[in-house]
């Protein structure tokens, strides 16, 4: 996964998302705008993916003095469709700013704002192909159960892996850290605290703090979307 343009796994999902969205927008004669908080990896990957794209722009918000991985060349190559905004504050200040913008539907819809993080299904689905690729590399070298160990993060990788499993990929499970929102009972079944509240009765998805717990609920039929 590090054999990508910027050397990070995010390139896989972001390149697919940007290319697909650019094609759709071109066919419809429309434009769209990414609004994301980034201090490095996401911004660098998005800047590379947007090179030469005519129908998509990106606003990257970051705390002053923290951004890495972006250079002047990124903006030259992109012909003016990357807009970096430096905020004199913390990463949480940046998140609050973006959250307040996405809360305003009257602004979001006419400007066709979207996100490049894994709340966007177009970014998440390509990650499902990580696991068949890994399986193709190890299937003849392993003669026992195959279990993937993953960092928790926002659970995007385990959701993508479970999608691959639902697509009939033969594997035996995932090992991920638990916390108060996601644990397991004595039988190993997932316990998702949020599942006691129907999805339609919850607050809107937080654009600043992406969580894929609702997708996990749907996979395990804890709370149908």
Language-model segments: residues:
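PLP-dependent amino-acid enzyme catalytic core
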Residues: 1-225
